[in-house]
């Protein structure tokens, strides 16, 4: 099985909250696509609660588009990581990490402004696979934590697992 890019970085050295360029590529037509690792929690030390991350998924995608789309950038998708320590964001364009961090913080401010669970987009049986598994309070706790801790930038060069370590791990 091919080694995925996300498994070539040392999760024991990752900071959170932090932005990292996880991957860059070009489409056959030459459009730049960038995948960002938006790390909300320190791996293996923290995890977002399932109801909170689910609610955040519904809110975050729209709020990030409001703050990041434009000037050569268009978000394709924002999806939670299975480990519940962050989100992956795929987009057309190549914004720098600081621009992404600033948009992320602005989106977290927007999450804190949501006053009622009924304001969560697509929160119904027709548009959500587990529409009863939500918590606005947990999503706002996550947002508050991000803003209190601020958003840093994780460097691939600093986090790269050495080839010897990858071989030791039988990868």
Swiss-Prot record:
Tell me any Pfam family this protein matches: LuxS
Relay the cofactor remark from the entry: Binds 1 Fe cation per subunit.
The family note in this entry says: Belongs to the LuxS family.
Q: Report which gene this protein is encoded by.
A: luxS
Keyword annotations: Autoinducer synthesis, Iron, Lyase, Metal-binding, Quorum sensing
Q: Write down the HAMAP family for this protein, in alphabetical order.
A: LuxS
Q: What does this protein do?
A: Involved in the synthesis of autoinducer 2 (AI-2) which is secreted by bacteria and is used to communicate both the cell density and the metabolic potential of the environment. The regulation of gene expression in response to changes in cell density is called quorum sensing. Catalyzes the transformation of S-ribosylhomocysteine (RHC) to homocysteine (HC) and 4,5-dihydroxy-2,3-pentadione (DPD).
Database matches in NCBIfam families: PRK02260.1-2 (NF002602)
Amino-acid positions noted as binding Fe cation in the UniProt annotation, renumbered to this chain: 54, 58, 128
Q: What catalytic activity is recorded?
A: S-(5-deoxy-D-ribos-5-yl)-L-homocysteine = (S)-4,5-dihydroxypentane-2,3-dione + L-homocysteine
EC?
4.4.1.21
Q: Fill in the subunit field for this protein.
A: Homodimer.
Which coenzyme or cofactor does it need? Fe cation
- Provide a GO biological process annotation: quorum sensing
Which GO molecular function entries does the Swiss-Prot or TrEMBL record give?
A: iron ion binding; S-ribosylhomocysteine lyase activity
What name does UniProt use for this protein? Answer: S-ribosylhomocysteine lyase
